[in-house]
């Protein structure tokens, strides 16, 4: 019987390495796909490992700039903070991984794609809903969800089938990382009362170890896109990396969050997002300077919905695409410079300027240069308060009667 082809999202870890052998037993030829999202792994090694374990072909694709410009940028412009805290580090990468899985599957004539998610996480939903949106005819296989092995059983299977066991297997943590940040769960972090140990962090310094002098960074934006740091232009992926190092050195972007997962459970995770939190903070301040009040007050409602859609795996949904159009319209005048102070875990905006600034000092000042028409206030107050005044008059008459 002719073997079918499956494209596997491959990380190089135990789960997806074992999945190669498991899928072979199901009569599949496996094509491994590894994406460089800026996590800092030796991906050339990962690519070769897939072949050594049994994949017939192995892809390694650098998608850092695509991830930065088409995913992280949109999240920054929408100030996406799930439950007010989490900047969607892992959730942002899943639709891009799904997109590349589908592209390679179609290119290779594969009938299925596979991922290494468990049956209790959000990522299985994000992958599978995204894949269905892009190609509803592809079969989706989730080996880890299907085999339901304990860690000990999985290791035993790996040893029986000569699957290399990672040297960091004893680490209690489950880590996911990309340009936008780093997420960490499991081990002692499963106790919401326990303080995260320092070895749970990698991108940021503990406050005790951060510099005792602040560092200032000027971030330049053009139409909502961060383009410069301290006057130096960068491709967006490099700007994010550079800012991760700058802000991380000052302990910016540590987040300890008990979140409500899509699958109905609560999960305690620790995130490090130095660049993400700094950029979101700076971008919001520039919007405050350049957006009219009505847009500035309405946009957070759209941001909340976009955040939920991304977290819930609905990146490719019709509603998400419609909300994108609103978001892009709001960014046309978000051009300017924001000065941020990085100090002891904080990214503090201390200055902002823009050629599209709607702040008029002559209208805002209380000095002799004031040009605000104070006399106009009387008529404005009369008309603005008229509905309230009429309501009060009518109801007081009823009480008196």
Swiss-Prot record:
Gene of this entry: argG
The protein's name: Argininosuccinate synthase
Positions annotated to bind L-citrulline: 86, 122, 126, 174, 183, 259, 271
PROSITE patterns given in the database record: ARGININOSUCCIN_SYN_1, ARGININOSUCCIN_SYN_2
Protein's cellular compartments: Cytoplasm
Residues given in the record as ATP binding sites: 9-17, 116
Keyword Electron transport: no
EC numbers for this chain: 6.3.4.5
